[in-house]
Amino acid sequence: QHWSYGLQPG
């Protein structure tokens, strides 16, 4: 996984 909840992907 390379994304976070509520945060921008990356």
From Swiss-Prot:
Positions where Pyrrolidone carboxylic acid occurs in the chain: Q1
Positions carrying Glycine amide: G10
Keywords: Amidation, Hormone, Pyrrolidone carboxylic acid, Secreted
Location relative to the cell: Secreted
The organism of origin for this protein: Alligator mississippiensis (American alligator)
GO molecular function: hormone activity
GO cellular component assignments: extracellular region
Top-level taxon of the source organism: Eukaryota
Assigned protein family: Belongs to the GnRH family.
Function: Stimulates the secretion of gonadotropins.
InterPro entries the record matches: GnRH (IPR002012)
Major localisation: secreted
Official protein name in the record: Gonadoliberin-1
